Amino acid sequence: MTKIKVANPIVEMDGDEQTRIIWHLIRDKLVLPYLDVDLKYYDLSVEYRDQTNDQVTVDSATATLKYGVAVKCATITPDEARVEEFHLKKMWKSPNGTIRNILGGTVFREPIIIPRIPRLVPQWEKPIIIGRHAFGDQYKATDVIVPEEGELRLVYKSKSGTHDVDLKVFDYPEHGGVAMMMYNTTDSIEGFAKASFELAIERKLPLYSTTKNTILKKYDGKFKDVFEAMYARSYKEKFESLGIWYEHRLIDDMVAQMLKSKGGYIIAMKNYDGDVESDIVAQGFGSLGLMTSVLITPDGKTFESEAAHGTVTRHFRQHQQGKETSTNSIASIFAWTRGIIQRGKLDNTPDVVKFGQILESATVNTVQEDGIMTKDLALILGKSERSAYVTTEEFIDAVESRLKKEFEAAAL
């Protein structure tokens, strides 16, 4: 079998625990036998991040800016227990957060719909894509414990000295409390809006943006104003010609409407809102194991894809004890395929794009047509008997078998 040549490199970011095991199986069984691809490898395991003082995370993001496409395995974000478990030098920051802050851009999370798998929200027939602004707000905030009575002030020193701000925020009573300062930038909000409008055009789906501008009149009002100005200036005519629309909604109203809808739209959300709501949407469509996550920069030139779930520690503990596991690898497979498809689009190599699509089709059809699935999906179908599901490895082997047939039939 002749391998398909991938014109330019893909950055590969390895990860932790059970997803690391899955990642290697996918790469070695489903990707490398079919593609002649230069993978620029970075080990983002928590041990190696610690060894390099997290420099490897920065290096992987820099490489992504250079080559344009990255695929990422799930990684551990250490807490106190993890620092102790791995004897880490310190509690390193979330690698996803570090990468997002270097790349900028917007994280779009989209469900993988398999008709056989029932949805918790049954009327969601079409995808709901959550666009999460991947910069600033709570994720780059400075927060403090206020130990005693005192005054909190908000101070901004402008470079020119003509727009300084010094505002009294609050007088703390005797026992103090907590305080937080967060920020965003006009450039980043504009980039977020552009990426959202561009995806809506590409997917021919209506776009909603959400804020709580009734409460945060200036902070959230800025997001609302940027989106509306950009839509009127650059996108209104394009949207109307495609029969789609843009609308701003209050976050609470949008969430309520979302539950009643049939799906089929994109919602652009601020960083925290998008973090929370994308998990709700994933569960509503069936499982976090059926959710893609891609980060796209506003110019569309830099792209990073990953699974939307964590490292599946519970299954990894079973694996360490020599017990069988049944871990859903679908989102990790799609992390690879979305990166492969994007690489093919950027390089204008249709065979690479087609291979990514065939691997996605083979993965979905392994469940949909062959009825082969991991335990989490069998449980959604109400089946807990051992014969209803396969092991982690058996599922990937079943996808491999189906991929061979679909690949040969496509005659690439």
From Swiss-Prot:
The record marks Y139, K212 as: Critical for catalysis. PROSITE patterns: IDH_IMDH. It catalyses: D-threo-isocitrate + NADP(+) = 2-oxoglutarate + CO2 + NADPH. NADP(+) binds at T75, I76, T77, R82, K260, G310, T311, V312, T313, R314, H315, N328. The keyword GTP-binding does not apply. One of its GO terms (biological process) is NADP metabolic process. Mn(2+) binds at D252, D275. GO terms for cellular component: cytosol; mitochondrion. One of its GO terms (molecular function) is isocitrate dehydrogenase (NADP+) activity. It holds the Pfam family Iso_dh. Signal peptide: none annotated. Binds 1 Mg(2+) or Mn(2+) ion per subunit. Keywords: Cytoplasm, Glyoxylate bypass, Magnesium, Manganese, Metal-binding, NADP, Oxidoreductase, Tricarboxylic acid cycle. It is found in: Cytoplasm. Substrate binds at T77, S94, P95, N96, G97, T98, I99, R100, R109, R132. Present with 2620 molecules/cell in log phase SD medium. Homodimer. Belongs to the isocitrate and isopropylmalate dehydrogenases family. This is Isocitrate dehydrogenase [NADP] cytoplasmic. It comes from Saccharomyces cerevisiae (strain ATCC 204508 / S288c). The gene is IDP2.
